[in-house]
């Protein structure tokens, strides 16, 4: 009896010890988990919201409207130096003409714009339709001269076609014009016919004006011959997301899901935790030394565009949240200025940034990605990085004297770069401010923009 009693006591002791060990393990695990739903001070949230409204209403919108409207030739005049002074007529590129149509349309749709901004969008839409659209072969040429009468770069690149679809979709939403929605549908199905890669997924990018294979040199972008770019497919996510919402078309949703797979898998170097840009047609990464670099801006932009794409496709974001965290955390580790706020431009694999200028569009995309990550995860570190990025933008990237944002700010603090040109428009920073205001407003109401 004594032996059995002793045995039971030993077993009870062992069970108690095992239970304590299990509880200890659970405690360690839970302590290691991120703190969720950490709430920033209300006064800080309001400070940022008010500041973003000021940037939009006093810095961004007044710079672009009405001075870029070309009343004589149509479209927008986008050739302004670092002080915002117009430098004279220049070619009109599809990328920035379309981005500016998108911005004025989105400004109107957001409620921050008025009828004058819808009219500005319609002015640009007419130029896309009448001057940049190729009546003979379909699709849009890359650029025309200042008058819109001569195609200075007549070939077709999917990067620019994507922005045309983005503009048409947003303008159709703003104007309720069936013509704009019809042109968007025509463009989508043209890209389906001419550019979709049914063998390897994604889209071929570079074509002659007649949609034959593009010339072997002068690709307008850095697309490898017969290859693909993460950058191009990143910027197909945007229009396919909004066009899926506008059209309700099953094929658009199918192609959107395909792009989600590309942008969450094919372009990711999983062992690194970051994306690279250049690929062969079959998505084999091209990792020559010049290509083995990380663009922090593209990686963090990819995160929030994927979040919105999943929502539009009716897919939950939960399965991809670890990927989002991986990409943003990589950028925060290697490409973030933890002293002054803001993101650097680029760097080698798993190394601190070596291109340390702060480029306007990188700050804009970082702002949105960080706020989305805070909303999605509740992790306060993303809110803190968001505020630090906002403070950098408000204090250093915004040009309060001449309007809009400095294109680039060097580590020394010297600003440089044009305010408007073939690559700079109100799209990145205007969109970022509008998007963050939308998210902050919904957060204040207790609603979520992420599912």
Residue ranges and their predicted role:
Residues 6, 29, 35-36:
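Residue-level detector of alpha-helical hydrophobic segments embedded in or interacting with membranes
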Residues 13-19:
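Short, Lys/Arg-enriched N-terminal segments with co-localized hydrophobic residues
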Residues 37-451:
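Glycan-recognition and catalytic cores of secretory/periplasmic carbohydrate-active enzymes
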Residues 19, 33-34, 67:
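Prokaryotic Sec-type signal peptides and long signal-anchor helices
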Residues 22-32:
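Bacterial N-terminal signal peptides
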């Amino acid at each position: 009896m004594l032996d059995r009693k002793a045995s039971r006591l030993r077993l009870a002791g062992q069970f108690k010890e095992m239970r304590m060990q299990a509880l200890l393990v659970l405690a360690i695990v839970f302590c290691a988990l991120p703190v969720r739903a950490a709430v920033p001070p209300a006064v800080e949230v309001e400070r940022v919201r008010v500041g973003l409204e000021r940037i939009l209403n006093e810095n961004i919108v007044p710079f672009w409207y009405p001075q870029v409207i070309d009343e004589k030739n149509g479209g927008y005049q986008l050739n302004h130096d670092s002080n915002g002074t117009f430098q004279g007529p220049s070619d009109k590129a599809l990328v920035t003409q379309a981005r500016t149509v998108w911005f004025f349309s989105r400004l109107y749709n957001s409620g921050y714009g008025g009828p004058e901004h819808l009219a500005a969008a319609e002015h640009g839409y007419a130029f896309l339709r009448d001057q940049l659209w190729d009546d003979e072969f379909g699709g849009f040429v890359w650029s025309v001269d200042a008058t819109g009468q001569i195609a200075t770069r007549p070939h077709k690149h999917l990067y620019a076609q994507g922005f045309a679809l983005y503009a048409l979709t947003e303008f159709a939403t703003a104007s309720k014009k069936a013509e704009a929605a019809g042109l968007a549908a025509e463009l989508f199905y043209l890209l389906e016919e001419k550019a979709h890669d049914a063998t390897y997924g994604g889209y071929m990018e570079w074509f002659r004006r007649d949609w034959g294979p593009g010339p072997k040199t002068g690709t307008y972008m850095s697309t490898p011959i017969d290859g693909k770019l993460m950058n191009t497919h990143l910027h197909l996510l945007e229009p396919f997301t909004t066009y899926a919402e506008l059209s309700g078309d099953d094929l658009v949703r199918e192609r959107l899901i395909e792009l989600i797979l590309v942008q969450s898998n094919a372009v990711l170097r999983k062992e690194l935790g970051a994306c690279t840009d250049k690929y062969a047609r079959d998505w084999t990464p091209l990792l020559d030394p010049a290509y083995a670099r990380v663009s922090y801006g593209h990686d963090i932009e990819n995160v929030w565009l994927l979040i919105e794409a999943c929502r539009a496709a009716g897919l939950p974001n939960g399965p991809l949240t670890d990927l989002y965290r991986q990409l943003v955390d990589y950028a925060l580790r290697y490409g973030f200025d933890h002293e002054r706020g803001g993101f650097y431009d680029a760097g080698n694999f798993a190394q601190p940034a070596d291109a340390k200028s702060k480029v306007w569009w990188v700050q804009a995309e970082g702002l949105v990605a960080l706020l989305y990550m805070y909303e999605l995860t509740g992790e306060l570190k993303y809110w803190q990085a968001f505020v630090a990025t906002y403070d950098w933008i408000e204090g250093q990237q915004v040009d309060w004297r001449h309007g809009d944002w400095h294109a680039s700010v060097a580590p020394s603090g010297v600003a440089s770069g044009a305010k408007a040109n073939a690559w700079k428009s109100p799209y990145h920073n205007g969109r970022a401010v509008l998007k963050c205001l939308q998210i902050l407003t919904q957060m204040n109401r207790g609603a979520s923009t992420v599912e």
